[in-house]
């Protein structure tokens, strides 16, 4: 028994040391990539964003700025007055299941834009949340497969949003001439001005909270409830 416990202790010590060395090496391999660039106002007037697994943040800024932090490869180019932004899995990561607890898997793309600069914004998101705040936008398209969509303190005209497993939350915003559809998840509108807009939900509730006395909207859900509350 004595030799057994000694052998077991030696195994545990060497296994632990090897694991720490491997995780430390693997952590360095997943080095965070950073991108930070500003663009001139006349460089483009349309933006197309196609993300696989990156969190997206869009907010107001004094100049158009793109920032990225994460371990994906970020691809950015301008084609025919359209800024195209996309991400893809870095080749250095491989495709094996990540067993390293030291690896932080958070990837964030932040875009700052001045008011009235962009004529059209297209967003396609795979597995990551979409958060839009404090912006004025016309002709916006959002397609999301998995990850919540949040719109706050914004003015959106002609918004076309279609999301799958993506709860959608709109608060303190002006929404007009828009179509918003959720396949699975909550659709919530709070303290917002709504004009000539349609809200659809296949599997989930539609909730209007703290709404003004005049709301020009149509709402329908296949499986769920529609609740409406005026601002008190």
PLM features per residue range, with description:
Residues 1-125, 131-144, 150-163, 169-174, ...:
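Acidic (Asp/Glu) and glycine-rich low-complexity loops/linkers
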